[in-house]
From Swiss-Prot:
Residues 1-64 form the 4Fe-4S Mo/W bis-MGD-type domain. This is Nitrate reductase. Disulfide bonds: none annotated. The keyword Protease does not apply. GO terms for molecular function: 4 iron, 4 sulfur cluster binding; metal ion binding; molybdopterin cofactor binding; nitrate reductase (quinone) activity.
Amino acid sequence: MSVVQSSCAYCGVGCGVSVSSNKPNWTDVDAADLILVGDNKHPANYGHLCAKGERLLDSLAQPNVLRYPKLRSGMPLDWDKASTLIADTFAKTIAEHGPDSVALYLSGQLLTEDYYVANKFAKGFLKTANVDTNSRLCMSSAVSAMQRAFGEDVVPGCYDDLEQADVIVLVGANTAWTHPVLFQRILAAIKANNAQLVVIDPLSTATAKQADLHLAIKPGADLTLFHGLLGYLADQNRVDHAYIAAHTEGFDTVVLQAQQLSANLADLATQVGVSVTQLTQFYQLVANNKKVLTASCQGVNQSTIGTDATNAMINCHLALGHIGQAGCGFFSLTGQPNAMGGREVGGLATQLACHMGFSQPEQQLLADFWKVDSIADQKGLVAVEMFDALAEGKIKAIWIMGTNPVVSLPNSEKIAQALADCPFVVVSEISPDSDTAKLADVLLPAQGWSEKCGTVTNSERTITRQRGFITAKGQAKPDWWAVSQVAKKMGFDGFEFDDNASIFSEFAALSAKVKQVFPTKVFDLTGLTELSKAQYDALAPTQWPIASATQIGQQNVRVFGLGEFATATGKAQFVTPAVVSVPQQSLPSNTLLLNTGRSRDQWHTMTRTGHIASLRASIPEPVVHLHSSQLSALSLTEGGLVRIEAIQNQIEQYSTETANPDLFTHASFTMARAVVDDDIPTNMALMSMHWSAQFSLTKGVNQALDARVDPISKQPGFKCQPVTLTPVELALQGVVFGQHYSSAHGLCWQVAQTLENGVCHHIGFTDTDDGFAYQATVHSLKWTLTVVGQPLYIQCNMDKGLLKALKVLSHTQVNVALYQMNDFIGKPVDKQLIKQLHQQIKAGNSPLICACTGVTEANINDEINQQFNDQVMSDGLANISFEQALDSTQLLLGCGRQCGSCHSEVKQCAKQSWKDALSYCESYSDIDHQPSVAEDVA
């Protein structure tokens, strides 16, 4: 059996995967012929994968795959005509309006080689730095903070630090869901080392539920919390004065400001929203342990003060002398598989390749290397600015690669309108179905994961080869190839690349040149400059900096450990934040702060995962999580529809330096079902970022968010924007299986859900007559079934006696087993089918808890009850153990024991079942004197 080692296509952990096939010839294999497992030799995951990673092969069966270039009209083109059209249009646009009238918008899904060629094309030959990436939306605040502190965008540590730390502090990071494989490593290390886990997050997330200390701070209080920590460390004389004097600058200024906060811990605790006991406990944990590591993610980055907040964390570790030491320091958790690779090649509009800026010497080096007279001489427009310029008509041609900005950028309606109005839009995609692809004037078929080859760099600076193992069908091409074809047709030299290996060779050579001229730069691929194609193809996972070929394969490499930094003075910089107070907002009566985040089993805008049935099952429709107290306050009902709309002119009260009113542009609204979740703060709502028009009639959450940004990084502040929530009254709602209409009069809610055996659509109508009329024909069979007081209106559409469409409606949410209901499609409609249909409807449905095993809430409830009864019968009520029951349940069902991302949900479900069983027994036995039973489920 032949095996191909590659990397996962999802988060920044950068897991290795092994793909094998029994077929001797890989040129004609498809997903059905393959087996995928974790690569047990890869240093990121050692064989482990999360639920999404385990289903990577399922992602290949896209419902609609783009195989040939085509125009918006649908007319197909060959590559020669498509590339000529793009080249001619870009050239004409630049000739008439200048180089900054064009732009490229890239993605952390691209490989480093794709990124490099795109940046060379734009900054070196088109002479514009209007090249940005969707990494701006997730990583740029951390990038800006590290550049300010260290002089370069460099994560100092590695994953091994998480396994050596005495205290791990996760800030704004639901790592159990966003980086599940890494979180399992963290939990294992905590258990082995008796370490402490601190989670700082306004939400009681799956990660927070497993922490030794959870600080549920106010939104935006991260900066104040860590600035106060710096003052506390100084007050307690815990800072490393010798290190500070020898290796840093700016401490005296920042510490004076910080000590004003730490002077009164009670006031500080009130500001950040925790008890003084919790605040002191956290500060003492940091002060009294030698190995403390702080890792942050989107909860910090996606804020209008994200850069300052990150610098506040770095300040603390600089003061302790932690940077570059084992088990210590600051670590930025990357969201995408190649966000770091894109930054290395200059994928952000604010930098050049190899971590260079726009100084004249850096420009000249790059111009000489690329053999051009000049390159782009100033920073370009970043993501939000780029699409603002598009809306204003300043950018007249844009090429979007591997990303879906109509969904992922804030103020989605404005983005869609800007693209619709733009004279020329090119989109490179694997599917024509994304919201952005539908607005392309030219749509180019790109090779996706499994087809393309190149490299990616993960959160800890490890470069991994992503290898193709399926031959691309149709005319799908690598993104670097498409850019090169256009560049050559525009008359540019330097794009005669034979393959991805030759691109990487050029990139490594540029890195060596930059290191030679600017020796303080940390980024270094000098050791990879002499790789042959065969050596490149066989390259093992390797962590940079790589000064010599002898370092190929190295891991656990830390930088800045000697106190030498990439700043002009060689010293790290303490950064004094512009404002340290927690932002205060006065919210009207029907207003909450909307927080956005991930669903456990989905990825980005769902173009890769939305069609995978097992990953869709846990959350079939858009939902908004609300505290139970808000339902009556806002006149909402659980399971009911909610309209979520942005409040205009609600500017976070930081200061004029950090809040630009011009950036607070008009936004629209979205809709979701209300879900009661008392882990949500009472002033907050939570909705996932994944939904789009591709799957939902009311599109996604960014419909309701405006485009406020961090003033330094220009990263959008997706977290905690004020919104109004109002109920949406549905006359009828339900599910339709089989044939369906994509639009109908009065249809205000429609969500497509992929099942193992087809697709169903969740629907809702504001008018009863419209609901009954939907898909009704003179031959439709209709009747009413009442289940537990709920009337259900059933309609069967038939063709030659076979069921073609099944509609189940009610006045409230319909809860049926979707897979089993869909099995009726295509079967003869007779008395037996109707009897089985009634039985299935009455059986109801149970929520999916574990995507890896398919275990539902009902499965866990049944097994916990069985364990409870068995223990009572064998040991007596006084000696029962919840932990034993939970362990046995997980062992039998497998839930929470594979990727581990559902562990907290499994435990929560089991705990409720256990409590219900105990409550039932109370009338038969006095258990007040049995503290061990109560403690088991506390």
